[in-house]
């Protein structure tokens, strides 16, 4: 799904997942919700703050669906806007259904999508970084980058679920 508010602002996959997650957690407190490694840390923080269990997954449609089954997650999403609903749906992504669920959220409030956008945490993230690397050394390179990041004081966490991710 893609969503743009009345101010012309794009709501990215992790922002939409926060909105879907907030609504779900009102109905099912403590629900497990999955994001992928490209989602901002704000997603995971916001879902936990709302009383959910936030889980980070590797990137990819089949990997997210498998993680949903493994964790019993009711909701999952990717930065690409693929949103997977197991709550009141069949556990896969469907853009029309995701749109209907967004309309449901809007119908349950007097706020506009622009108002809901304003309620989201301000996010800063970097684009995905891909560096050409021969297959025979790529795992060693990721391990070395991971170790260097762990050695830096300003890095608050290093996540190696899928490649390497650093939070500052």
Label each region the model flagged.
Residues 2-16, 43-44:
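Short Gly/Thr/Asp-enriched flexible loops that form oxyanion-binding sites at enzyme active sites
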Residues 28-168:
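Phosphate-binding and adjacent anionic-ligand microenvironments
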Residues 10-27, 32, 58-59:
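Short, acidic/small-residue loops that bind anionic groups at enzyme active sites
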